[in-house]
Amino acid sequence: MFNKNQGSNGGSSSNVGIGADSPYLQKARSGKTEIRELEAVFKKFDVNGDGKISSKELGAIMTSLGHEVPEEELEKAITEIDRKGDGYINFEEFVELNTKGMDQNDVLENLKDAFSVYDIDGNGSISAEELHEVLRSLGDECSIAECRKMIGGVDKDGDGTIDFEEFKIMMTMGSRRDNVMGGGPR
């Protein structure tokens, strides 16, 4: 999910929201869909919803992608990304990490990779059961009924599953437990 071309360039950032003057956010805003997609992906990483990604949350995502990463390496990765120095990755740092040297094709590839994680049986669609299994592996205690509601919110053809095009819509909407429960995007 992360851009392999990233580097570390000191500086500070604010956790009070997204700095409008951030060059990375300005670049991402050049495609409004891209920033919404990044926000949705950030929310998936930010399992507890506190607005930042911890090494534990990063580890859960990496494990779900089939990569067992030792805690020390996760902490080192966080330190390299964490310009604010608080031990977490905030949204602005996440956008910077995921937009440095990236174009729309890279974003599309990242979404395809994410889709393949959720499409456990590889049949080209994601069922409520597959969504449930992946979200639970990430620490999200959602029910099958909630997963069905999430899928129902973007299932344009009514087949009870989501294909890649519907998945892109779901990621853009940030469709997750918060939307299912009527809270809307965080």
Swiss-Prot record:
Organism of this sequence: Arabidopsis thaliana (Mouse-ear cress)
Binding residues annotated for Ca(2+) 2, in chain numbering: D119, D121, N123, S125, E130
Pfam families (alphabetical): EF-hand_7
Record's keyword terms, sorted: Calcium, Metal-binding, Repeat
GO cellular component: cytoplasm; nucleus
Protein name: Probable calcium-binding protein CML25
Biased composition (Low complexity): 1-17
Region span, Disordered: 1-23
Function: Potential calcium sensor.
Keyword Ribosomal protein attached: no
